Structure formats: C-alpha cells, structure tokens
A protein has these predicted regions:
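Short, conserved structural micro-motifs that define repeat-unit consensus positions
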Residues: 6-8, 40, 70-72, 95-99, ...
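Vicinal oxygen chelate
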Residues: 82-123
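Short, charged/polar, Gly/Pro-enriched secondary-structure boundary elements
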Residues: 45-49, 105-108
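Mid-chain, well-packed structural core segment of small domains
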Residues: 63-87
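N-terminal beta-strand motif that seeds the catalytic metal site of vicinal oxygen chelate
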Residues: 1-15, 69-71, 118-123
Length: 123
C-alpha cells in the first residue's frame, strides 16, 4: 500500500455537508445522478466522497456492528473546532482528542495535531 485515497460517507441530506465544512473541508467536485448526488470534499490532501441519499437506512450504533468503527481527522487546535464534541481527553500516546458525530450519527474522532516536540509518538 502507498496511501489512503479517500473516505466514502453517506449522508441523508445536502445540509449535512456544512458539518464537514466546519471541520475545514471544501467542495471540489459534484456529480448529480438520478438516484443520488456525490460530492467530493478536500482539506489538506484528505478527500471525503460524500453520497447524499435520503433513502439509505440509518446507521446502527448500539451495539456496534463489525466493520468501520469511526474515522479520525487531525485538527490544528481542538479548542477552535466549531462542532459539538465530547470532553477533550488524552490518548495512550499523550495526544489530545475528542469524539463527535455528524448529523446522521457517524462517529468522528478529532485528534489534535502533533507539535514538533511530540515527534513521531503517534505514527
């Protein structure tokens, strides 16, 4: 493997894109299809492919099913994130992090960017 290309998400409505915009993502391409809309969003080389489709079933949350548990994005400063989050904690590597959910309930981890003195401690 040489890298991660993108993360694909399904959202129920167009307005939910604003959640990802608050995290810094910007729309770079939109494809309108007869059965859904696909929006590519990018921030610092991270691409999310967002499928807007109100007809998908809701996410099963408890108990968690096998498969993807959550996605994690790195942010510059957790105190400046403009979405409602859980209490900020420290992970096993000493980095600050928190969790939030997008409007459709997709769990999102937000992790504060390493500082130069952190070095490689969370790679």
């Amino acid at each position: 493997m040489v890298g991660l290309d993108h993360i694909a998400l399904i959202v129920s409505k167009e307005e939910n894109l604003s959640f990802y915009e608050k995290l810094g993502f910007r729309e770079v391409k939109r494809i309108e299809r007869s059965y859904d809309t696909v929006v590519f969003m990018e921030d610092n080389g991270v691409i999310i492919e967002v499928f807007i489709d109100p007809n998908h079933p809701a996410r099963v949350s408890n108990p968690e099913a096998l498969g993807l548990r959550h996605i994690a994005f790195v942010v510059e400063d957790l105190s400046k994130v403009d979405v409602e989050c859980e209490e900020i904690r420290t992970d096993w590597f000493g980095r600050r992090f928190t969790f939030t959910k997008d409007p459709d309930g997709q769990p999102i981890e937000l992790k504060e960017k390493n500082t130069p003195e952190d070095g490689e401690k969370n790679r």
